[in-house]
């Protein structure tokens, strides 16, 4: 990347995720390269020619063997990305606090060629029991007997946890700078341990939730449901307005947890994650926690 004036700011090239800046001429942006999941997220600074940007990412996709390039933008910017071959795969309501985010994607063949006609649509979603789309009072979620929970905020510990369980959980960091949750619920019942984490963004009042130890059996559903609920309660105390989660579309039990807690699917993302040697579609679940007004100018100015 150095020949293209891209500056690496992550810890090393052997890491599964790199954050890279690119600046050349009037093009200026940052991107998150996730080699484990064969995708790349663009953080665009809204300057430069979109066709040049697209051509640049097409070259990276071929060089890195990527399946997907995507970006998360406001509505007015989505039109520019659509004009150069990106497809809208869904939205994250309230992602920018007062505006929704559109997920714009470009999917590639095994030969690194962009798939013509845009990202292929995923098949029909699996039937998931629960109350998807309905508001649910989180107070009604009962704590399983014998379950003990603790909130963890130690960055080093959270980094170690992701390093240990992240791959099996299909964890994929979504933000810049820190590639692990900054808060997590650690739950214990007997000899079994569970982790649910969140990447928070106080500027925009949202958080991404991940079950780092996803349910493998029906009997684990009440435990994970309570862990997610406890984390949502804590995020609400931090004035988080909304949360979202990315989940493999065929992980029925994990999808059921979000459904039972009143999340609803707002995006279906083709070949968004990689499991073993297989590209897997993902569902994006969203839930609003509170209607938090945009900060007053006086608070921003101190």
Residue ranges of each PLM-predicted region?
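A conserved beta-strand-loop-helix scaffold within acyl/acetyltransferase catalytic domains
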Residues: 17-39, 44-46, 159-217
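Conserved GNAT acetyl-CoA-binding A-motif
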Residues: 61-73, 235-247
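Conserved beta-strand-loop-alpha-helix junction that forms the acyl-donor binding cleft
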Residues: 70-78, 245-255, 271-275
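Conserved acetyl-CoA-binding loop-helix of GNAT-fold acetyltransferases
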Residues: 47-60, 219-235, 253-256, 260
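Short amphipathic alpha-helix that is part of the acyltransferase structural core
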Residues: 2-12, 35-46, 118-174, 295-302
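Conserved active-site tyrosine of GNAT-family acetyltransferases
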Residues: 80-81, 257-258, 263
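Short acidic/glycine-enriched loop/turn segments that link adjacent beta-strands
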Residues: 36, 96-100, 179, 203-206, ...
């Amino acid at each position: 990347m150095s020949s293209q004036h891209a500056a690496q700011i992550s810890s090393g090239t052997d890491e599964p995720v790199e954050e890279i800046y690119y600046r050349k001429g009037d093009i200026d942006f940052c991107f998150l390269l996730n080699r484990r999941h064969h995708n790349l997220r663009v953080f665009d600074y809204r300057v430069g020619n979109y066709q040049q940007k697209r051509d640049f990412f097409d070259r990276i996709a071929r060089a890195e063997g990527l399946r997907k390039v995507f970006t998360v933008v406001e509505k007015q910017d989505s039109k520019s990305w659509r004009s150069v071959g990106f497809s809208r795969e869904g939205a994250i309501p309230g992602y920018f606090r007062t505006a929704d985010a559109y997920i714009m994607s470009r999917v590639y063949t095994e030969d690194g060629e962009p798939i013509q006609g845009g990202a292929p649509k995923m098949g029909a979603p699996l039937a998931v029991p629960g109350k998807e789309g309905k508001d649910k009072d989180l107070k009604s979620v009962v704590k399983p007997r014998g379950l003990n929970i603790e909130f963890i905020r130690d960055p080093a510990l959270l980094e170690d946890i992701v390093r240990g369980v992240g791959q099996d959980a299909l964890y994929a960091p979504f933000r810049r700078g820190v590639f692990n949750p900054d808060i997590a619920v650690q739950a214990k019942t007997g000899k079994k341990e569970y982790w649910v984490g969140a990447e928070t963004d106080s500027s925009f009042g949202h958080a991404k939730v991940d079950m780092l130890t996803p349910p493998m059996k029906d009997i684990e559903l009440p435990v994970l449901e309570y862990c997610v609920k406890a984390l949502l309660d804590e995020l609400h105390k931090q004035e988080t307005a909304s949360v979202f989660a990315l989940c493999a579309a065929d992980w029925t039990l994990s999808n059921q947890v979000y459904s039972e807690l009143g999340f609803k699917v707002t995006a279906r993302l083709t070949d968004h994650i990689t499991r073993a040697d297989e590209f897997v579609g993902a569902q994006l679940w969203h839930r609003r926690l509170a209607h938090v007004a945009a900060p007053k100018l006086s608070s921003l100015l101190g």
